[in-house]
Amino acid sequence: MSIAYNKIAVRVRLGALRRNFETLRRMSPAAMPVIKSDAYGHGLLPVARTLEAAGADAFAAGTVGECAQLRDGGIPGRIVALLGATDAADAECCVARSIVPAVYSADQLEMLAGRAAPGQQVDIALKFDTGMARLGFSEADLPALLDRLHARPMLRPVLVMSHLAVSDDPSRSDFTRQQGEAFGRILAGVRADWPAAQGSLANSAALLAHPELHFDVQRPGIALYGANPLRGTAQEHLGDGLQPAMDVAAPILQVHPLPAGRSISYGRTFTAPRDMTVAIVATGYADAYSRGLSGKGAMTVHGRRVPILGRVCMQMTAVDVTDVPGVAAGDDAYLLGGPGEALTPDELADLWGTISYEVLCLLGMNPRTHRE
């Protein structure tokens, strides 16, 4: 999906993605890249093809529709739909295209079993809740679930999954350990009947910081795209080798003086304390560049950090280029990345008051190009 009729350019560096994947695979050779939500805004198929060429043999996406795009795009290996089959059409698609759906309800078991052809086996991923309280069977559900599976031999659990709630916070490692212990018990229970079932618990933070929770398959997400899930913690150094893979730029429309005492933008929230030079950049909240950055965000122009002045508008934002010589209309202003004093996804998220995941998913909705 792309935001139309704007001037933003999103440039995805596939080489950085590949290097991040290679870094993570050195820690966990069985890493299954998570490329849900259009690969966190980086482009589903280009990212999948790059990582497949780098050695990835399985992927996890969000919806069955995304998984179908991967299959139709020529991705041959295991593809896991993390949201599972949410309706009959999803179930039919999973069975027909060999997509592995997460299963977290008895209704989903029935939908999938009812669509298997005679003699066909349908691979599924059993999703358990070990502390996230989101999707999944409980540990107490396990005996009844195993009985249901035995009664439906066309369904084959190839993966057992759960999700960690605070693996990115070393101060709450006790809860992460409790989740790991619960998952270990669940996995052992499933393997008593299906010994080939693989366990998958570790997300990006656990891949970096909790090798004891790697089990068989790891699911790196945000770390693939160069954001450090352990930033701001005592374990931040574990993600030091990750490289942001997205640059976002917009053209400067005009450069003009702002005399001392003159205000700028809606609401007159900023008044120049001295004679200044401002650049008007062709981006705003209609381009998924948050209005919350008004008066506190920054961009990079000619490799220098420049602060936002006043309110972010629908399609325009003003920045202070007083101390940056030679700025002219047509020059690029970098909202994210770029040369020099580049803003990382984590830094922009701090200014935005959110997390790097949201920054990448939203800005990635703008027109994209891919390069090495």
UniProtKB/Swiss-Prot annotation:
Q: What does this protein do?
A: Catalyzes the interconversion of L-alanine and D-alanine. May also act on other amino acids.
Cofactors: pyridoxal 5'-phosphate
Source lineage = Bacteria, Pseudomonadati, Thermodesulfobacteriota, Desulfovibrionia, Desulfovibrionales
- GO MF annotations, alphabetized: alanine racemase activity; pyridoxal phosphate binding
Task: Give the matching InterPro entries.
Answer: Ala_racemase, Ala_racemase/Decarboxylase_C, Ala_racemase_C, Ala_racemase_N, Ala_racemase_pyridoxalP-BS, PLP-binding_barrel
Q: Where along this sequence does the record place binding of substrate?
A: R134, M314
Listed pathway(s): Amino-acid biosynthesis; D-alanine biosynthesis; D-alanine from L-alanine: step 1/1
Q: Which GO terms describe its cellular component?
A: cytosol
Q: Which residues form the active site?
A: K36, Y266
N6-(pyridoxal phosphate)lysine modifications at: K36
Among SUPFAM superfamilies, the record links this protein to: Alanine racemase C-terminal domain-like (SSF50621), PLP-binding barrel (SSF51419)
Q: What is this protein called?
A: Alanine racemase
Q: Which UniProt keywords apply?
A: Isomerase, Pyridoxal phosphate
What reaction does this enzyme carry out catalytically? L-alanine = D-alanine
What is this enzyme's EC?
A: 5.1.1.1
Q: Which GO terms describe its biological process?
A: D-alanine biosynthetic process
The UniProt entry's sequence similarity note says: Belongs to the alanine racemase family.
Q: Show which residues constitute the signal peptide.
A: none
